[in-house]
């Protein structure tokens, strides 16, 4: 049997990152959350274990036809395999702190679990005289 334990993948080799267009917004305004995988190892059989629950947000998924891997620099390091796994437009449904739960990923059949950190957002109530408008 093959010894898969001889190859260890570090947090720098494979991780997920949720890019958001902003962290503070008015109730009814939107933000875009883009889930990206960053890898310095070959990626085979990438599968999300669970989609992050966007509790407190109305969501609209943006269709991603397939994962297209590109080269990108992040925190001073070059990653040859960076791809968008999911893109979602989020609309906060109430004021206060809103949270996106961690996300888990299995890759390369090794059962490697990569987790996106917990994220929080501030939903600001709509002010008197201000009408929330959808962002283009």
Where are these regions (language model features)?
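Surface-exposed interaction/ligand-binding surfaces
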Residues: 1-136
